[in-house]
Amino acid sequence: MAFCSSLALAAKSLWLRCFSHGGHGVHSPFAFELLTRVVEEKSLYSAFASIRDVVHRHGRSEQDLRLAFLFYRLAAHYPIKRIQVLGADSDYMQELLPLLERAICPYPSEHPYGPYPREDLFSLFFITEEAALTQIIEEPPPAILLIPTWQNPSLKRRTIRYCKEGRLSGIRIDLPTAQLVISSPRFHLQQYKSTL
């Protein structure tokens, strides 16, 4: 009988619990890094205390706090040329923009988590309305879209439909409270689900 350490078994269990891809593994190195180092990351950043203060001051929920943390991790981990918050009921995210802009590095080759290919200079969007989503998909990629759907199921359906129609191409991650889309011609359509 082969020996497996308890750490290896725990990692395998976490992998099976966190990432579901219709019974298949994550084959894209970019998607694997996105899932493990950004979406599922548990490390605390020094900016999280400031983010928590802003979210609580606006009386937002725990789901909004998790999305704000994820939005910050996305800004910190990828080369970002611009950040926009689009839609109503996102005043807390508007207040976080200066903090997010301090975290970005717009140079793919010099990025602390890189280097990234030159074509991976993303626009980062937080979208809360269908009209804003329709407007953004007309812009040229690459873009990272974080779309909170826990209060607006029709926005989730619209995002999935745009991905199936090919209007949004790239990686789509179904989160419990949001849709995360990495729209880039570099990636073929990939769909994942994170349960954490």
Residue ranges, per PLM feature:
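Short beta-strand/loop segment that forms part of the nucleotide-sugar
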Residues: 145-148
